[in-house]
Curated annotation (Swiss-Prot):
Motif Bipartite nuclear localization signal, residue range(s) on this chain: 474-488
Modification type Phosphoserine: residues: 69, 497
Location of Phosphotyrosine modifications: 283
Subunit structure: Identified in a histone pre-mRNA complex, at least composed of ERI1, LSM11, SLBP, SNRPB, SYNCRIP and YBX1. Identified in the spliceosome C complex. Component of the coding region determinant (CRD)-mediated complex, composed of DHX9, HNRNPU, IGF2BP1, SYNCRIP and YBX1. Identified in a mRNP complex, at least composed of DHX9, DDX3X, ELAVL1, HNRNPU, IGF2BP1, ILF3, PABPC1, PCBP2, PTBP2, STAU1, STAU2, SYNCRIP and YBX1.
Function text: Heterogenous nuclear ribonucleoprotein (hnRNP) implicated in mRNA processing mechanisms. Component of the CRD-mediated complex that promotes MYC mRNA stability. Is associated in vitro with pre-mRNA, splicing intermediates and mature mRNA protein complexes. Binds to apoB mRNA AU-rich sequences. Part of the APOB mRNA editosome complex and may modulate the postranscriptional C to U RNA-editing of the APOB mRNA through either by binding to A1CF (APOBEC1 complementation factor), to APOBEC1 or to RNA itself. May be involved in translationally coupled mRNA turnover.
The protein's name: Heterogeneous nuclear ribonucleoprotein Q
Region (3 X 4 AA repeats of Y-Y-G-Y): 370-398
RRM domain ranges (all copies): 72-151, 153-235, 248-318
A GO term, aspect molecular function: mRNA 3'-UTR binding
Region (Disordered): 407-533
Annotated region (8 X 3 AA repeats of R-G-G), positions in chain: 358-469
Domain notes: The domain containing eight Arg-Gly-Gly repeats (RGG/RXR-box) may be involved in RNA-binding and protein-protein interactions. It is methylated by PRMT1, and essential for nuclear localization.
Amino acid sequence: MATEHVNGNGTEEPMDTTSAVIHSENFQTLLDAGLPQKVAEKLDEIYVAGQRKYGGPPPDSVYSGQQPSVGTEIFVGKIPRDLFEDELVPLFEKAGPIWDLRLMMDPLTGLNRGYAFVTFCTKEAAQEAVKLYNNHEIRSGKHIGVCISVANNRLFVGSIPKSKTKEQILEEFSKVTEGLTDVILYHQPDDKKKNRGFCFLEYEDHKTAAQARRRLMSGKVKVWGNVGTVEWADPIEDPDPEVMAKVKVLFVRNLANTVTEEILEKSFSQFGKLERVKKLKDYAFIHFDERDGAVKAMEEMNGKDLEGENIEIVFAKPPDQKRKERKAQRQAAKNQMYDDYYYYGPPHMPPPTRGRGRGGRGGYGYPPDYYGYEDYYDYYGYDYHNYRGGYEDPYYGYEDFQVGARGRGGRGARGAAPSRGRGAAPPRGRAGYSQRGGPGSARGVRGARGGAQQQRGRGVRGARGGRGGNVGGKRKADGYNQPDSKRRQTNNQNWGSQPIAQQPLQGGDHSGNYGYKSENEEFYQDTFGQQWK
């Protein structure tokens, strides 16, 4: 048996490296170059893991507490590629004691990949590092970006049978994945016995969540005889305590259908002057004039019965502009296939977007993530771990999995296409082909597919055209490529309409990585690196 000293620190027991150590294809090259065994193995780790780690538990004289928990790690982006630990560690040690630092490396060039993760011993040190070094000029003309790193341990799972309970879902998914700790499930407002067809699975840590995601997305695992829809959910971000200390708005959920804004105003006004009350489905926002009134109301009313339901109250999470920007980017990417969709943030009312009805182009709806309520309600994330924790979209964006005018109408007549600019374009349909649907009246110059459509100029829009005749499921005769459906493709699942899941933090790869585009990255890459491209 070959015996080797791997770590090079003090007296070591022999170990069988042939089975315990997995080397990359570059390991022999390093040995052939004359490098010592230990040095070659350390360098080979960079090829395998794609990172270089500094530190570990610091000496007891520096820190003798427990292992750091959530909120102690920061992400450092836009690092100059030729900058290493010898400059990063002294810089960040000024914010507090460091537990470890992981610098992502490019093994081919020996340079870093432009980002790193620093874990501090305390949350306070991590928050101080963000304040001190976000947009810090680390070299002349080179500014780094720093933010709290959030290890995502939640998965969105769609296509859940609506009759299943939280306990049944927890039991079923525990059979096929490891480390599942909780299930977050929402019920339909008008029928508390039924769920909304989706849930969130919470795992012990990001590593187990990533493994579960890969397993569930493999197509080999079926739950209740079906392959589910699985995506990353947005991770929970702890709000700034200084910001939360100023919040005067309460988020109230689990309201009965009979509860009105007038009832809420009467119930909460006894604790202080109200600026306004806004109820949406079975939740509401209560705006107080003073924070003291909001604090007192939450203490007195949380868990109390209101019109037959026990309400739950937390402070509403204020706007996070960076999260809104990320949401806008994800939403724009999700809707690239949709015609005439652009993101408009509150408080401006967006113009209506086209529905997906096929005859007469359907009715008009609003963008999928616009909820119709005023001003900044869309910004609130309801950061509460027992429901909707930290997620930006109110869960009513998933209501019955139907948003706006998404229904398919009958296909309209397939006549000549309109001219789209300065001059007539040739017709798209085949000459002499029969119409596909019944004729529809013109909507100005835009009507059913058989009629002429409006030019893409400054024409006058007239009345809406009717829907075309129903020829459900037939293919277009002229070879026109029909755009993909807005509905998520779920392998012919048959549990009713499918949900449109929260977008993952980046594309839909199956590796568990997100934020970075390298095949070498593993589960440790758990933050929003895409902010600093």
